[in-house]
């Protein structure tokens, strides 16, 4: 079964902590999940400052800069994995480095 693990983080907090996961650690973890045959896809997303929100209401498209809502945490990336069941997917998700922050 496929599971989508969403990675949320507070960008300011993540980059201010001396022990926060760095790109190398995240890439190494993604590589280990890929080598296990469980990774279908995974990507880090661009910083929230580059976000654009697109909405369509009653046939009219509205485009605004930035995320739709002010939040403390932002969607920072994702892992799509193949797992036997939810428990295996949870074990994979708990190993994602930013999950510790």
Predicted regions and their residues:
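Conserved, structured core segments of small domains
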Residues: 1-101
């Amino acid at each position: 079964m496929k599971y989508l693990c969403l990675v949320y983080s507070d960008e300011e907090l993540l980059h201010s902590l001396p022990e926060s996961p760095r790109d190398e650690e995240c890439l190494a973890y993604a590589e280990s999940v890929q080598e296990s045959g469980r990774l279908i896809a995974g990507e880090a997303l661009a910083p929230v400052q580059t976000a654009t929100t697109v909405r369509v209401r009653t046939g009219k498209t509205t485009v605004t800069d930035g995320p739709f809502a002010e939040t403390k945490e932002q969607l920072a990336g994702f892992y799509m994995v193949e797992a036997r069941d939810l428990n295996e997917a949870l074990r994979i998700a708990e190993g994602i480095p930013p999950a510790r922050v």
